[in-house]
Amino acid sequence: MNQLGALAQVSRFTQNFSMENIKSEFQSLQSKLATLRTPQEFFNFKKISKPQNFGEVQSRVAYNLKYFSSNYGLIIGCLSIYTLLTNLLLLFVIVLVVAGIVGINKLKGEELVTPFGSFKTNQLYTGLVCVAVPIGFLASPISTLLWLIGASAVSVFGHASLMEKPIETVFDEETV
């Protein structure tokens, strides 16, 4: 019964999509992409060096996480897409669940009438759960998520700790 409640919450979430919400999300995405740094700046090998101590690592990471935040978000997004494309079963389960919820919501609470009988909405959600959960376990979402977290952390924190800060910021820190 708890799973049906969770599915009902997801269905309410999908009903909250409107053109205004989509437009506002698109505008926020555009503003985020406007802060994207150029590849020449992001992959500037002349600014890569080994930090002297852990304090410098912390300083570099703090600065670079703010400065390259859009680039890091793009890297995490690309890694997420790569993860789904290499785990096709997980992608199938996600598409199945989303399509199932959207399809059930299109019924608007009415029964689905088939030649095999009529099915109520809660029966359809139960059937979706009974199919998606076992296949979802086979798709190994936990190991995929852990790989994504690890690959993202190594990529982002590796770049942030090795990329030097601009010289101007070093002088600003000393005067404070």
From Swiss-Prot:
It is a multi-pass membrane protein. Disulfide bonds: none annotated. Its main location: Golgi. The keyword Glycoprotein does not apply. The modification Phosphoserine is found at S18. The modification N-acetylmethionine is found at M1. The chain crosses the membrane at residues 84-104, 129-149. It is found in: Golgi apparatus membrane; Peroxisome membrane. One of its GO terms (cellular component) is peroxisomal membrane. InterPro entries: Prenylated_rab_accept_PRA1. Keywords: Acetylation, Golgi apparatus, Membrane, Peroxisome, Phosphoprotein, Transmembrane, Transmembrane helix. Interacts with YIP1 and the Rab GTPases SEC4, YPT1, YPT6, YPT10, YPT11, YPT31, YPT32 and YPT52. Present with 5500 molecules/cell in log phase SD medium. Belongs to the PRA1 family. This is Prenylated Rab acceptor 1. It comes from Saccharomyces cerevisiae (strain ATCC 204508 / S288c) (Baker's yeast). The gene is YIP3.
